[in-house]
Amino acid sequence: MSGKLYLCATPIGNLEDITFRVLRTLKEVDLIAAEDTRNSIKLLNHFEIKTPMTSYHEYNKIDKGMVLVEKMRQGANIALITDAGTPGISDPGEELVSMCHQA
């Protein structure tokens, strides 16, 4: 797989608790996969991040996961974010990481 998946931790409370590295990653990737785009758009707008975003959540994790893995196979770099915190802890991120390992 030539593309990469970035697991990006987002602030639990104050939006300004995000790291510079995560902000740079969110601006540089080809696509952001967000657990809840309605919440994540607030973060992206606050920091003027214009990267395209798609939903990736509990109810579409298998189908959307396959789409995201295929995009990475084609060279796309994707950032995975959750509503708050680190992907893979109490959210569908674990499933996408597993799919990437199997690809």
Locate the predicted segments by residue:
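Short glycine-/acidic-enriched loop or helix-start segments at secondary-structure transitions
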Residues: 17-18, 43-44, 65, 89-92
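Short, glycine/charged-enriched secondary-structure capping and boundary segments
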Residues: 21-24, 46-49, 68-70, 92-97
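Glycine-rich, highly charged phosphate/nucleotide-binding loops
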Residues: 60-68
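Glycine-rich, flexible N-terminal cofactor/catalytic loop recognition
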Residues: 1-59
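Short alpha-helical
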Residues: 38-39, 63, 87, 95
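Short glycine-cluster motifs
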Residues: 74-103
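Short loop/turn elements that form and flank the Walker-type P-loop nucleotide-binding site
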Residues: 1-2, 49, 73-75, 101
